[in-house]
Amino acid sequence: SSFIRQLLKAGKLENDLLKDKNEKFIITTLHNPLKGLEGDVLLIAGSDKRGTIYGVYELSRQIGVSPWYWWADVPVTHQDAIYIKDGIYTDGEPAIQYRGIFINDEWPCMGGWTTEKFGGFNSKMYVHVYELLLRLKANFLWPAMWSAAFYADDPMNSPLADEMGIIIGTSHHEPMARNHQEYARRRQEYGPWNYQTNKENIDRFFREGIERMKGKEEVVTIAMRGDGDAPMGPDTDTRLLENIVKEQRKIISDVTEKPASKTPQLWALYSEVLEYYDKGMKIPDDVMILLCDDNWGNVRRLPDLNAKHHPGGYGMY
């Protein structure tokens, strides 16, 4: 902000505290920082939007507001007085770039509740999810997808997330910023979910997703599984998946008008996809490899510390 720039120019704030940092905040006190701003000042500053948000919510937490005040009815702690220590408080930069949750297996509990209270998985409900994530210093969300279509059911779901600083992705079997329900509801238009026999329509479905998310901060899930979160088939050739990813990245590049590597992507090695990877399936260097458990909490694979460095990094689902 212009205010922070004035403080930096006046030497009231050290430039290297926030410069070139990711999602970092500082909370500090200043005395007579600028002309016209006399007395003691409490300053919350961030290296970027989320850094600033985390700083505000960290102060809220230390005052006595739990991140779960809304979702779990945690009482707000009463304080007779609030004191601020001199010096600089910070959590530093996050060690993990993308930190978030997947709203999965949401029916009947959450689905029934949000339908009764908000009319569905819409922005009236998601605003509370976004706030919770930010208060927990998270930044990433895979939205509910059993019967919901995050992008289509409420056109405000995605823009609100982007405005608040939440990065949206789609689940392991929903590639190219599309929800499975979007395909299921228009199956007569798009045809069978089979890339070998219906490439043109599926590519169109993919392209529409990237066009819709263009300009927003999202992580694009790539590759493909079978229809409705099922395996593609026992005889699936890894070369088919590699070709699908090649075509998807071409679409990403065409729509965004920049190299595909400039758009964050992940490939989820869920279930049988890990077996393809073990057989030598090639993953582009810039794509995040999302390792997964076996649905029972048993981690199937960890990054090999002796393997060649993978620039795209790794995640755990």
Model-identified regions with their sequence ranges:
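Short, glycine-/Ser/Thr-/acidic-enriched flexible segments
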Residues: 1, 49-50, 106-108, 147, ...
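Contiguous, structured surface segment used for ligand recognition
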Residues: 1-93
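The substrate-binding groove and active-site-proximal loops of carbohydrate-active enzymes
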Residues: 43-46, 104-123, 138-148, 183-202, ...
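Short helix/loop capping segments that flank catalytic or ligand/cofactor-binding pockets
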Residues: 52-55, 110-112, 143, 151, ...
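An acidic-aromatic substrate-binding cleft motif
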Residues: 66-119, 124-144, 312-315
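Gly/Pro-rich turn-and-neighbor structural signature
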Residues: 75-83, 152-155, 160-163, 190-313
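Hydrophobic faces of well-ordered beta-strands that scaffold small-molecule active sites
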Residues: 99-103, 134, 140-143, 168-171, ...
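Aromatic-lined substrate-binding rim segments of carbohydrate-active enzymes
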Residues: 147-176
